[in-house]
Amino acid sequence: MKKKFTFIDLFAGIGGIRIPFDELGGNCVFTSEFDKFAQQTYEANFGETPSGDITLINEKDIPKHDILLGGFPCQAFSNAGLRKGFNDTRGTLFFDIARILDYHKPKAFLLENVKGLRGHDQGRTFKTIISVINEIGYQTIESEVLNARDFGLPQNRERIFIVGFWKHKNFQFPIPPKTPTRLGSILQKRVQDRYTISDKLWASTQLRKKRAQQKGYGFGFSLFNRESKYTSTMSARYYKDGSEILIEQKDKNPRMLTPLEARRLQGFPDGFKIPVSNTQAYKQFGNAVPVSVIRAISKRIVKHL
C-alpha cells in the first residue's frame, strides 16, 4: 500500500524531482518556479501553474508538508564568517529553502545541486549549507554524488544530493545498480534533416576542437553513436549548437539530439508533454534532474518517513 504524504516542489523547473514522489502516492501541495517557459511545461504536465519568485513568497503562506524538494542554484555566501550561520545566507536562494525549513520543519527534505557544490568557494558554500540545516535542528543529514549513467540512463551526469530528516534515521543512499546502458536505447529511428548540423557549423566546431587541442586544453564537441555506452553531460546551453553531444550519421554531417531524445536522456517518461519551442525544450531538459536517480532516492526517503 502506498504511503500518504505531502510535499512541496521548489525551484521546480519542469518537475523532474516531483515525478517519482507523485508515483509513490505523494500529494504536492505547493510549487514554485520563476521561469515562465518552465511554468508552461509544468502546467501542461501537472495541471497546475507554479507560483513565481520564491523570494517574494512568505513561508507562512506555504502549506504544511512532509517533504521539501528543491534543486537550487549554486551561489557563494558572500559574508560567511566563521560561525556560518543562518543570516550569512541572506540574499541567496538557499536562504529561501532555509527559512521554509526553519518555519515548517518538514519530516524530510531532498536538495539537488551540481557536483561542484562540495568544492565551491573552497568548500565554504557546502559547509555553510550543512551548518545552517544543523542549526535549524535536523538530526540526520546525508549527501552523495550520484551519476545518471549508473542508474540506467546513457548520460554521464554527476549531481550532488542532500537528504535530511528532522529525527534521527538510518538513511543510506541507494547503491547504484550500474545497469549497462547504450545510447541507441533512447535514439529515434528516423530523424528530420533539420537536426543535422550545417557544413559551416561542423567546420567551425572541428576547428575549435583542433585549436583547443593545440593549446593543450579540452574542448568538446563529442561525437557519439548508437553503440556508445553514454553521452557527455547535456547542459542548458545545448540549444546553441548542440556541439557537446553530436550523433554520427552515415554519409552526412552529425546531428543534434531531438527534444524527444533529450527528454529520454534525462529519464522523463515518453508521455511527458513538451509545449514549448525546441530552444526552450533543450534548455529545460539541460537544466533538469535525471528522473531515474530521483526515483531511486525517493523510495528510500518515503520508506523512512
List PLM regions with ranges.
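Conserved SAM-binding strand-loop segment of SAM-dependent methyltransferases
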Residues: 47-54
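Conserved SAM-binding loop
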Residues: 42
